[in-house]
């Protein structure tokens, strides 16, 4: 089975990358994150509803080919997401939905980041500052405008409605 990367699959990989569960291929987190991952996995036909396993804070399924593909994309993220396009936007939106935060002061950060993530953001033109395992974006509005059409978990956040008002 040959698996091909699509923008929608890039979003799922971004979610999985920051919130992966130890069992199978899945994520752990709050209800909205689990619901989004489940819906995306079913919509992309990664699995069927009877093979989707859930616990209190995890949702996952077993599929060796997809697991290997997700791991390959993770290892090659600097090459696969080197352009400002729909693939990169979906991947970063998935990462932001899984581990991103906008504070009350408007600081945009992504938790659970490593040097490879920092390099990916820098290559795409997003200046960052790393503080322990968090990555703070220097120009948050540019980043949020780039991913706003692709976020699913955090799409109701007030910062995205602010961006829509500012655009008009």
Segments predicted by a language model, with ranges:
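Internal intein/HINT superfamily modules and their associated LAGLIDADG
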Residues: 1-168
């Amino acid at each position: 089975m040959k698996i091909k990367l699509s923008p929608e699959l890039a979003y799922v990989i971004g979610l999985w990358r920051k919130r992966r569960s130890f069992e199978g291929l899945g994520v752990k987190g709050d209800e909205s994150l689990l619901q989004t991952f489940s819906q995306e996995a079913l919509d992309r036909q990664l699995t069927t509803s009877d093979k989707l396993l859930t616990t209190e804070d995890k949702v996952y399924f077993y599929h060796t080919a997809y697991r290997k593909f997700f791991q390959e994309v993770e290892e090659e993220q600097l090459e696969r997401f080197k352009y400002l396009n729909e693939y990169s936007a979906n991947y970063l939106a998935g990462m932001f939905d899984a581990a991103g935060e906008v504070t009350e002061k408007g600081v945009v950060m992504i938790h659970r980041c490593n040097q490879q993530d920092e390099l990916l953001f820098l290559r795409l033109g997003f200046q960052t500052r790393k503080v322990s395992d968090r990555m703070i974006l220097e120009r948050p509005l540019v980043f949020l405008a780039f991913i706003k059409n692709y976020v699913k978990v955090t799409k109701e956040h007030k910062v995205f409605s602010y961006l829509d008002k500012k655009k008009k």
